[in-house]
Amino acid sequence: WDPILDKFEEKNNCEVDLQIIPWDNYSEKFATAISAGEGPDVGYMYAEMYPQFIESGAVEDLTNYATKEDKEQSIYIKTSEMMGGMYGMPFQAANPGVLYYNKDILEKLGEKPPKTWEDFKRICKKATQDTDGDGKIDQWGLAQGWGAKTFGNLNWNWYPYLWQAGGDIFNDDLKSVKFNDKSGLEAANFLKELQAYVPEDSLSKDSNEMIESVFGPGKAAFTIMLSSAATSVFDESFPDLNWGFVTGLEDKKAATFGAVDHLSLMSSAKNKELAYKLIQHMLSVESMTEFHKAIPRAPITKGEPYQGDERFKEMVENDKNVYRPLVVGPHGVEIYEYLWKELQTMISGDKTPKQALDDAAKYSNDLLAQ
């Protein structure tokens, strides 16, 4: 960032203090800084962070700041609309959770990459085998971990299936949830059925651990993880893994989770006009082209060349209608945390899919009614 920010400092006769915060507990550290009056003028935020800051007035509505050119230049500008306002400018996107498959396993099974739930379940069943004849399953259909203590694995274990079934988390008015409706129950029942083809220790491992111990070593036909895992995990740790990917399965529609993170103007900024100018500068075609040359990612602005992983170029160009972020709604973090724990009880068998979803929905709706 230094050469990019140097240009801004010189042009605007100011100094920019860029602070990089480690990802672990990022949202908690961010919130603590704001409550202590030590927050940034411009903050990097992801969807789950926004509700509390919008409700407390800590983040500025950009409706009167963003120009027509700003909006036209941004590829993912629609994601800026949150809870009745415009609270950020898209900064990081096009790194969705894709369905990876083991090409060698599918070839041995005589199967092509799946398109539908029916395809997926059939292949998972065929792939789940005792390959060495010792009486124990040693190859699985799906490497899926349910042991994470926090809700982040909803990105791979829940949202894609919910959206593919035609469901969503919130009703349109954001005053109640809908994930326990017919579509949500279809998704939950499907996930429960898939557990016959998932390693038995799924409740003791998270998704990353399942990839490291099962999919990466070639012991599963499928897993779901960020497209960037191709470089950060497979290329680094499993260079011999023969993999391919499907952007998202289809039931009622094709869908998968793809976060869009934003740069936001914080209400505590003393010079809001200058702070917004910084956002504009950082997100300009020139700046993003320079940044993505050093840190390869898909374009965030129109006119920017593609400098990301070539293996995902076609996906980025053609599947923008398949991957999507969360709808930002009130009490998001509390709702997601509770839902995750209820889904874990479903996987463990302590509750039926309907019981788990209904209990999570009751908690959520009681919270939203306060």
Show where each model-derived region lies.
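Extracytoplasmic/periplasmic solute-binding protein
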Residues: 87-91, 97, 121-176, 220
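Hinge/lid segment of periplasmic solute-binding proteins
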Residues: 45-97, 112, 121, 137-140, ...
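Short, solvent-exposed loop/beta-turn-alpha elements that line the ligand-binding surface or hinge
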Residues: 60-74, 78, 112, 132, ...
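Glycine-centered hinge/linker elements that transmit conformational signals in sensory
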Residues: 123-126, 173-204
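Extracytoplasmic "Venus flytrap"/periplasmic binding protein-like
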Residues: 7-75, 81, 86, 104-115, ...
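Conserved C-terminal helix/tail region of periplasmic/extracytoplasmic solute-binding proteins
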Residues: 6, 15-16, 107, 302, ...
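C-terminal lobe and pocket-closing loops
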Residues: 51-52, 223, 227-240, 251-341, ...
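Short amphipathic alpha-helical coupling segments at ligand-binding clamshell hinges
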Residues: 3-4, 14, 183-190, 261, ...
